[in-house]
């Protein structure tokens, strides 16, 4: 694996093979913790890794079942507790050695490291318990490691605020790396200084300077900043520390110090560290490469003790191979506790490093990443692969052009979505092309003064912001994607809403304050403006902003009344009063309709999935783009340099001169009055300007298209948010009761013009005409997310529903009849013309559902109440052609009084529905009484025979006649759906009577065997309900009509309307009080059946509207395994074309049979099909239905029983002998098979003849 080299001054040559490691999903944290801890304690007890017996090198063994166990010798050592005492004696010989486990536990308790289980401290009995309690032993080992680390690092200096040993060790490593960085930069500057006079007096010619130090810049190392144990995962910090103390053993050129560290690079560095520890440290390196790479939280103590051993080796023991490198400011291991200097020359030097401000330090003044830290470092709770490798690696943001690499932005470009969705780390491709105005040439010299520290947050701080609920601090100068509400700085220093720029433009940033603004999700006062867009709060909007052209596709509305967070966060908000928002809306806020909000949430979740998929694809393309840029040399960037400077200047001039971007992607005046210098905040522009390679143009176009698609999806989600806000907002009309209000986060008002009308008043408002209120935007209110991604304008509009009255009916449609469409047609166009307000040529909508009957769209215009309440409303009342299934604004010209009439009609319809539900409930009770009386009368008349056929069929007519008034009263208002329901009930009544009439005939003429047996089984008529309800789709009349003869309760009407019954109709007001009050057609009083026995959801779907309330105890009724047998025959017993005729014959027999339980007869345990039997529930005899076998099988003949597993398509033998409803197959005793025994003697007897 490693080819060692002599430690001479010559170059070290090491050959490494990339080792095979376990992926993160296969890496077992608990197993890794046990292995590392046992290896450490064994090495500590035996005085070094070389003294451990070979049989104990691997503490685990694998048994024949592939299960890992601790080896018995290790177990014996742990149970005797001798191992711990020997480890104490070897590691701390100057201290008193505890003689027994109790003394050891007392000693650890005195030192403050009490080993504890999750619920209590470890006792001596736990250490001697058999079988071994590994958790107790691991707790003792952790306490030993902590005690040893404290003892070894007594001389470790550090800031007084750092009370944790982990913090002090990380501070030591970070300080050592910082000093090494300064030393390296000084050496690079000295090497570059002799070449400076060759440039002449032309500092404005950066190309010559780049040529001179091209070799140096190409090999410039990027030193990491260490703020947590996660930063050690790349191995760069540890390897650099080893180089500082042992430069002759590990040269700096041997260490991989790159900015985007791949897994192979990290493994290379970690192998260097592992080899050094194994060869130089007394206890070696008990951690595996996976442990060092993934840095799991359970191994935190193990990593800390490894750092402590390194410190003891380098600073306390100081063996011969430790030859400390001469670093600036004295000794490397003597960091100044309170005056640690910040890294120098970290902007444009040959070894660029950007130091992120540590999350636990105060924000004032330059400081070291760990100075003044209080509290504990928070390690990331997420262990995803990317985050485990480089969660807190720091990225350099202002590099030379020759070093354009990927960097990690702690907040994504759309940070409000990323924070909610839990994806705070997105690898973005950064390029210095067209990121800002051209900078002067000295900005790239190695002696550039450092920028102000504390510009961007660390990943840990981003996670802290995500996982903390109280008001949080946003890091100074956070990336533009990081959005926050209501900065304490006021409107003077607003933040950009989006880091995306329109193509061909460059957007300067305002200077960020050093004090971090406070992130307040729920502002208390609406007086402070929200820094939504540059120039929004401090400057009045341009006149062109009021035109639809400027606002039609703008993702962020200027002067919006309420600033909303992301769509995902919005679902978690409570219903808030809107009084303090200054909008004049009513104060009563009833709860929003749950069904409507759930549908909207489901649709938004699908849109979110699409957005994340496009974002992931965009990140992949950006990664490819970054790698491609890294492969380019200095000469390619030199060609780009002059064009970039001119292009950026033109872009800046264009931005200053132009008004709003076409399509309203950027408000007018956004760049006015802004400084031309760009600070350290980063933006990402899809258009990267001229590039030296054709491939870069393709990458740019792909990234731009994906970014455009992503922004359009997010605009769709925002329009969904606005639509839901309008639909659920309370009305303002006087004299009308307010409907359920929307979820509102009270926000600021930016001026007198900012108070837009209430969302409820804007329900039918349009994109094209301004509303009745003094709003600047024709589409108000726009509760946009400040971090909306903005790109080239796309003609993409999600138009809300035409009429709010159609929305309560959405819950009455089924996915089968009206599919909820979530198509999101994405226009990936590079140059899209601005959207014309009148023509709307490229209108793309995301339909929320279908609009219904063409007869009901003119609500509020004098249409009758019946037409208003129809379930099927048309998309357009103005005669415009209907496009797809989208909702469009068509009623934009209706005045306010018509809107008030609409609201009043909506309330009236709701009252009418409640009254109608009460009437329907009363009518159902009357109908049940009539059915009970008719059933009793028919039961008495059935005794003579089939004579009641003449009198029973006409009896079906009184019930429809009696229902006629109710039908006339309710039908016109309910529309087609209600009429179908009443017709279905009439059919149900007819079929019930026909079923009862034909039952005696079926019992008398159904065959000698089955008919007689059925006559003695009064309960058999109720057994098919649930089974037939689960039956696969067949012909509407043919196969189901035969079920009348099998006394099925599933009537013809429910079969013919089965598709309509699956509509998911929800009528909570028409629910029956209890399922026991419903009378199934086949439940006759003379059949001695109990109502609660046979409650089946398939008996009458029209009259049993999905009761979900409390139920009485229900005895389990006999269910059918017909379809399990069907599945077994089709996929297991008689699968394939060869057996298809036999399978079809048997399936026909199953369909003809009236039995509920079928069993397959196997020849023997090899499960060879022989016959199909039916089980009699009373006699427990099996009767052959088809196949070969005994005609009747008694329980004494059964040898084995089997159950079929539909998922695994196989039979499993049950260790029982009793037949039950869960048995699907059986075998009989071998001597009962008489088929082949007579044939063998015949052959033998025929040979003498």
UniProtKB/Swiss-Prot annotation:
Low complexity composition-biased segments: 189-205, 341-352, 594-604, 754-779, 950-964
Keywords: Cell junction, Cell projection, Cilium biogenesis/degradation, Coiled coil, Cytoplasm, Cytoskeleton, Microtubule, Phosphoprotein
Composition bias, Pro residues: 437-454, 731-741
Composition bias type Basic and acidic residues, residue spans: 568-579, 889-940, 970-998
Residues forming coiled coils: 594-628, 696-729, 896-935
Domain notes: The CKK domain binds microtubules and specifically recognizes the minus-end of microtubules.
Record-given protein name: Calmodulin-regulated spectrin-associated protein 3
Species for this entry: Homo sapiens (Human)
Taxonomic placement: Eukaryota, Metazoa, Chordata, Craniata, Vertebrata
Gene it is expressed from: CAMSAP3
């Amino acid at each position: 694996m490693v080819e060692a080299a002599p430690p001479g001054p010559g170059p070290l040559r090491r050959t490494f093979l990339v080792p095979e490691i376990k992926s993160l999903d296969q890496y077992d944290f608990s197993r890794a913790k046990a292995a590392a801890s046992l290896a450490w304690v064994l090495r500590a007890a035996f005085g070094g890794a070389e003294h451990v017996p070979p049989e104990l090198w691997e503490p685990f063994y694998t048994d024949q079942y592939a299960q890992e166990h601790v080896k018995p010798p290790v177990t014996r050592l742990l149970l005797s507790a001798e191992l711990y005492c020997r480890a104490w004696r070897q590691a701390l010989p100057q201290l008193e050695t505890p003689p027994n486990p109790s003394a050891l536990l007392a000693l650890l308790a005195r030192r403050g490291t009490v080993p504890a289980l999750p619920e209590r401290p470890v006792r001596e009995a736990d250490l001697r318990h058999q079988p071994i309690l590994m958790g107790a032993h691991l707790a003792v080992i952790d306490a030993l490691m902590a005690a040893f680390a404290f003892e070894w690092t007594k001389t470790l200096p550090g800031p007084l605020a750092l009370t944790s040993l982990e913090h002090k060790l990380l501070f030591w490593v970070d300080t050592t790396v910082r000093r090494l960085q300064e030393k390296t930069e000084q050496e690079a500057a000295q090497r570059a200084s002799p070449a400076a006079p060759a440039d002449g007096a032309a500092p404005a010619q950066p190309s010559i300077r780049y040529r001179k130090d091209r070799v140096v810049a190409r090999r410039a190392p990027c030193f990491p900043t260490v703020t947590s144990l996660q930063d050690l995962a790349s191995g760069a910090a540890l390897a650099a520390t080893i180089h500082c103390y042992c430069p002759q053993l590990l040269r700096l050129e041997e260490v991989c110090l790159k900015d985007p560290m791949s897994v192979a690079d990290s493994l290379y560095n970690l192998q260097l560290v592992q080899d050094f520890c194994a060869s130089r440290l007394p206890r070696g390196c008990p951690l595996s490469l996976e442990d060092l790479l993934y840095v799991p939280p359970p191994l935190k103590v193990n990593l800390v003790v490894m750092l402590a051993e390194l410190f003891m080796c380098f600073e306390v023991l100081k063996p011969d191979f430790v030859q400390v490198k001469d670093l600036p400011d004295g000794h490397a291991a003597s960091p100044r506790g309170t005056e640690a200097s910040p890294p120098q020359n970290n902007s444009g030097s040959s070894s660029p490093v950007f130091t992120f401000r540590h999350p636990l330090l105060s924000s004032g003044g330059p400081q070291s990443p760990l100075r003044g830290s209080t509290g504990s470092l928070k390690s990331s709770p997420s262990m995803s692969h990317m985050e485990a490798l480089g969660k807190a690696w720091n990225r350099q943001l202002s590099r030379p052009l020759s070093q354009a690499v990927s960097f990690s932005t702690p907040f994504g470009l759309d940070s409000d979505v990323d924070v909610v969705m839990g994806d705070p780390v997105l690898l973005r491709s950064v390029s210095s092309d067209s990121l800002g105005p051209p900078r002067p040439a000295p900005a790239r010299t190695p002696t550039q003064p450092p920028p102000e520290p504390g510009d961007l947050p660390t990943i840990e701080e981003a996670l802290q912001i995500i996982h903390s609920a109280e008001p949080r601090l946003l890091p100074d100068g956070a990336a533009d994607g990081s959005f926050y509400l209501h900065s304490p700085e006021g409107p003077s220093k607003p933040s950009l809403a989006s880091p995306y720029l329109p193509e061909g433009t460059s957007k300067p940033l305002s200077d960020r304050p050093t004090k971090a603004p406070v992130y307040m999700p729920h502002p208390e006062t609406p007086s402070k403006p929200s820094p939504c867009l540059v120039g929004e709060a401090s400057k009045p909007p341009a006149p062109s902003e009021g035109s639809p052209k400027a606002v039609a596709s703008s993702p962020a509305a200027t002067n919006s009344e309420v600033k909303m967070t992301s769509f995902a966060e919005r679902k978690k908000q409570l219903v808030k009063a809107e009084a303090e928002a200054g909008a004049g809306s009513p104060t009563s806020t009833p709860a929003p309709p749950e069904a409507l909000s759930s549908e909207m949430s489901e649709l938004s979740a699908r849109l979110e999935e699409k957005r994340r998929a496009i974002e992931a694809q965009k990140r992949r393309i950006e990664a490819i783009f970054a790698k491609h840029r890294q492969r380019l040399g200095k000469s390619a960037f030199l060609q780009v340099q002059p064009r970039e400077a001119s292009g950026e200047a033109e872009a800046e001039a264009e931005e200053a001169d132009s008004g709003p971007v076409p399509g309203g992607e950027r408000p007018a005046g956004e760049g006015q009055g802004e400084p031309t210098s760009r600070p350290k905040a980063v933006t990402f522009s899809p258009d990267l300007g001229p590039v030296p390679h054709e491939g870069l143009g393709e990458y740019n176009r792909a990234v731009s298209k994906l970014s455009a698609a992503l922004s359009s999806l997010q605009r769709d989600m925002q329009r969904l948010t606005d639509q839901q806000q309008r639909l659920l907002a309370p009305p303002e009309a006087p004299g009308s009761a307010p409907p359920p209000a929307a979820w509102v986060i009270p926000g600021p008002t930016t001026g007198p013009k900012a108070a837009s009308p209430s969302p409820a008043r804007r329900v039918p408002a349009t994109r094209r005409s301004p509303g009745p209120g003094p709003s600047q935007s024709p589409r108000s209110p726009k509760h946009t997310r400040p971090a909306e991604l903005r790109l080239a304008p796309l003609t993409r509009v999600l138009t809300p529903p035409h009429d709010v009255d159609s929305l309560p009916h959405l819950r009455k449609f089924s996915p089968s009849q009206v599919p909820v469409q979530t198509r999101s047609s994405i226009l990936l166009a590079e140059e899209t013309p601005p959207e014309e307000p009148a023509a709307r040529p490229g209108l793309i909508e995301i339909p929320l559902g279908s609009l219904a009957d063409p007869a009901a769209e003119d609500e509020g215009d004098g249409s009758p109440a019946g037409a208003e309440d129809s379930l099927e409303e048309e998309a357009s009342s103005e005669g415009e052609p209907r496009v797809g299934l989208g909702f469009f604004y068509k009623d934009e010209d209706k005045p306010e009084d018509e809107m008030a009439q609409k609201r009043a009609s909506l309330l009236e319809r709701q009252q009418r529905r409640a009254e109608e539900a009460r009437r329907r409930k009363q009518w159902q009770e009357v109908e049940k009484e009539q059915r009970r009386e008719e059933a009793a009368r028919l039961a008495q008349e059935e005794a003579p025979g089939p004579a009641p056929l003449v009198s029973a069929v006409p009896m079906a007519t009184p019930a429809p006649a009696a229902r006629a008034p109710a039908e006339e009263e309710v039908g016109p208002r309910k529309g087609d759906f209600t009429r179908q329901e009443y017709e279905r009930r009439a059919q149900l009544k007819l079929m019930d009577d026909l079923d009862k009439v034909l039952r005696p005939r079926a019992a008398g003429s159904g065959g000698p065997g089955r008919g007689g047996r059925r006559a003695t089984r009064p309960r058999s008529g109720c057994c098919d309900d649930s089974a037939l309800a689960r039956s696969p789709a067949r012909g509407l009349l043919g196969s189901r009509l035969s079920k009348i003869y099998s006394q099925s309760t599933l009537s013809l009407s429910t079969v013919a309307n089965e598709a309509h019954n699956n509509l998911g109709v929800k009528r909570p007001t028409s629910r029956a009080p209890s399922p026991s009050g419903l009378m199934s057609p086949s439940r006759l009083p003379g059949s001695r059946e109990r109502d609660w026995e046979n409650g089946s959801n398939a008996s009458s779907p029209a009259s049993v509207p999905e009761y979900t309330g409390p139920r009485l105890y229900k005895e389990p009724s006999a269910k059918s395994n017909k379809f399990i047998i069907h599945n077994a025959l089709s996929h297991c017993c008689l699968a394939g074309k060869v057996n298809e005729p036999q399978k079809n014959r048997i399936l026909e027999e199953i369909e003809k049979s009236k039995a509920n339980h079928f069993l397959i007869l196997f020849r023997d345990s090899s499960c060879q099909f022989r016959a199909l039997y039916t089980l009699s529930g009373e006699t427990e005899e099996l009767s052959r239905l088809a196949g070969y076998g005994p005609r009747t099988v008694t329980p004494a003949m059964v040898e084995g029983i089997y159950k079929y597993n539909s998922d695994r398509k196989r039979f499993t033998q049950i260790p029982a002998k009793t037949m039950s409803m869960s048995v699907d197959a059986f075998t009989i005793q071998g001597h009962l098979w008489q088929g082949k025994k007579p044939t063998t003697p015949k052959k033998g007897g025929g040979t003498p003849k």
